């Protein structure tokens, strides 16, 4: 798929991407939300649920699957990152072939935000060191080869703030020149591999001038916003914070600056978000820079949240059908 606009689904193969608190040590009354964010020493991806979700996405007209890899795969150059049940390279390759056969373009995702890198194991505590840079390049190269040279590679880089790490046992937040040094180092390496870097765009929310000055236009942008209010009137009526207004504004700012975008929506906060994201972004983003849409339900590939993930697929498919019929 090259020219066709993407309709993507974000699916989790790995899960150790939030808190560094071990799952085994979680409080007895911990909610599903907390448990999902703890790190586990085994792969929590349910193969049967994975199959049903991917088949359903293909049946509903999706053409892209963004795979959050994390610790979910055994990296040939870094076997120490695997956990019990991590997919072998052979298993992953066979599944990627199946996905392509049903019309889903598989795209690798590895998140290098210091808030979301628990999957890096001991290297999670070595951020910005020579060994950290080596392991990042090793897993990027491995994933690039395992995916047979994909045209896009999502490298994350969202939510690297102290607030987002308040529940971590070990916290590290890069800022200023160090954040840009590390980001541009990874971004450049991905481009040298022969693929296009893709990131979450929330860095722009509170560092707009710096972002517009330093973010390469070659990087595909996924701004994300999961609430129901988009217009100025809706935001004012909801008494939205200045932060929330900035989240929505970012779509327009990125467009004005000439960045390619693939907006991310979700049923995490409400069921109407995907439809309203499509409506808003079609209005404000030029067709040649609007590369598609992605839904990200943010639940793991487990039976207990399968219905929520299926609903995310259905809501996105319904919104795209409305768009096709001119009802948005």
Give each language-model segment a name.
Residues 1-4, 146-147, 213-216, 254, ...:
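Extracellular/periplasmic catalytic domains that process cell-envelope and extracellular macromolecules
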Residues 7-220, 225:
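Aromatic-lined carbohydrate-binding surfaces of glycoside hydrolases
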Residues 46, 50-51, 88-92, 132-137, ...:
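Well-ordered, non-membrane alpha-helical segments in soluble/globular domains
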Residues 57, 99, 190, 254, ...:
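Hydrophobic alpha-helix position signal
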Residues 90-96, 135-140, 223-233, 284-301, ...:
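Short, basic, helix/turn surface patches
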Residues 116, 150, 154, 163-167, ...:
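Charged, low-complexity C-terminal accessory regions
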Residues 124, 197-240, 269-285, 302:
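Substrate-binding cleft/loops of secretory-pathway carbohydrate-active enzymes
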Residues 257-328:
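Substrate-binding cleft of secreted/luminal carbohydrate-active enzymes
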């Amino acid at each position: 798929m090259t020219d066709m606009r993407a309709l993507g689904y974000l699916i989790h193969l790995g899960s150790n991407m939030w808190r560094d608190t071990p799952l085994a040590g979680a409080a007895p009354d911990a909610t599903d939300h907390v448990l999902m964010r703890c790190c586990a020493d085994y792969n929590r991806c349910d193969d049967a649920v994975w199959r049903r979700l991917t088949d359903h996405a293909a049946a509903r007209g999706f053409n892209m699957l963004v795979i959050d890899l994390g610790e979910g795969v055994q990296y040939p150059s870094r076997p120490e990152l695997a956990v019990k049940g991590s997919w072998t390279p052979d298993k992953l390759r066979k599944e990627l072939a199946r996905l392509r056969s049903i019309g889903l373009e598989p795209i690798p995702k590895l998140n290098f935000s210091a808030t979301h890198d628990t999957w890096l194991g001991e290297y999670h505590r070595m951020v910005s060191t020579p060994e950290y840079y080596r392991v990042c390049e090793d897993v990027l190269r491995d994933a690039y080869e395992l995916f047979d040279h994909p045209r896009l590679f999502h490298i994350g880089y969202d939510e690297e703030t102290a607030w987002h790490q308040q529940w971590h046992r070990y916290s590290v937040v890069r800022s200023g020149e160090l954040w840009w040094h590390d980001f541009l180092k990874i971004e450049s390496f991905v481009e040298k591999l022969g693929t296009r870097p893709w990131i979450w765009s929330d860095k722009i929310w509170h560092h707009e001038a710096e972002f517009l000055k330093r973010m390469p236009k070659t990087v595909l942008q996924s701004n994300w916003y999961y609430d129901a209010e988009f217009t100025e009137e809706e935001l004012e009526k909801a008494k939205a914070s200045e932060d929330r207004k900035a989240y929505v504004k970012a779509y327009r700012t990125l467009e004005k600056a000439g960045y390619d975008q693939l907006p991310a929506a979700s049923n995490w906060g409400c069921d109407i978000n995907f439809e309203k994201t499509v409506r808003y972004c079609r209005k404000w983003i030029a067709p040649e820079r609007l590369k598609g849409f992605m839904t990200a339900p943010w639940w793991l590939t487990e039976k207990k949240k399968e219905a929520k993930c299926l609903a995310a697929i259905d809501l996105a498919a319904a919104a795209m059908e409305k768009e096709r019929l001119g009802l948005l």
